[in-house]
C-alpha cells in the first residue's frame, strides 16, 4: 500500500511540474514575444499578425502529426521529452533574432524583411515543438493516465 502512495505522489509531482513548465512556456511565448518584436524588430503589427497566423498553422500540423504518431507508437513520454527540450531550445534561440537589427528597430527594408522572416520562422518552429511536447504529448499522456 505504501509503494502505491509513493507512486501516486511522484505521478502528481510530474503532472504538476510538466503542466507548469508547459504553461510558463506558452505564457512567455504569447505575452513577451509580441512586445519583443514590437520593441526590437519593428513597430509594425503586421509581423505579429504573420507570427500568429503561421504559428497557428504549425501547431495544428504538429498536433495532428505527433498526436497520431504518439497514438500509434504508444510512447507519449518520448514525445513530451523531445518536444519540451526542442521547445526550450527554440524559445531561447528566438531572442537571437534581435541581433539581425542590432537591438534597434530595423532601419532598412532589407533588414526589416530578413528580421521579420527570421522572427516568423523562429516562432513557427518554437510553436511546432511546443505543440509536439505539450499538446500532442503531455495532454494526451495526462488523459491516458486519468
Language-model segments: residues:
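Helix-loop boundary and gating motifs at the non-cytosolic
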Residues: 2-58
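Hydrophobic transmembrane alpha-helices of multi-pass secondary transporters
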Residues: 10-22, 86, 114-126
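Hydrophobic/aromatic residues within the transmembrane alpha-helices of Major Facilitator Superfamily
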Residues: 20, 24, 57, 61, ...
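Hydrophobic/aromatic end-of-helix segments at the C-terminal termini of transmembrane alpha-helices
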Residues: 29-37, 101, 138, 142
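Interfacial helix-cap and linker-helix signal at transmembrane-aqueous boundaries
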Residues: 37-38, 69-74
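Central cavity-lining transmembrane alpha-helices of secondary-active solute carriers
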Residues: 48-70, 84-90, 94
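C-terminal ends and interior cores of transmembrane alpha-helices
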Residues: 81-113
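Cytoplasmic helix-loop-helix junction between adjacent transmembrane helices
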Residues: 123-146
Amino acid at each position: 500500500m505504501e509503494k502505491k502512495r509513493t507512486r501516486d505522489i511522484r505521478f502528481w509531482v510530474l503532472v504538476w511540474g510538466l503542466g507548469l513548465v508547459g504553461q510558463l512556456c506558452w505564457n512567455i511565448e504569447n505575452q513577451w514575444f509580441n512586445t519583443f518584436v514590437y520593441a526590437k524588430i519593428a513597430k509594425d503589427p503586421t509581423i505579429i499578425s504573420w507570427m500568429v497566423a503561421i504559428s497557428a498553422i504549425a501547431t495544428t500540423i504538429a498536433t495532428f502529426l505527433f498526436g497520431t504518431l504518439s497514438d500509434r507508437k504508444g510512447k507519449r513520454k518520448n514525445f513530451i521529452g523531445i518536444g519540451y527540450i526542442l521547445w526550450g531550445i527554440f524559445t531561447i534561440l528566438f531572442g537571437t533574432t534581435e541581433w539581425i537589427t542590432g537591438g534597434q528597430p530595423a532601419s532598412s527594408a532589407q533588414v526589416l524583411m530578413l528580421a521579420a522572416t527570421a522572427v516568423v520562422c523562429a516562432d513557427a518552429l518554437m510553436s511546432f515543438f511546443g505543440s509536439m511536447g505539450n499538446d500532442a504529448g503531455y495532454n494526451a499522456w495526462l488523459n491516458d493516465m486519468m
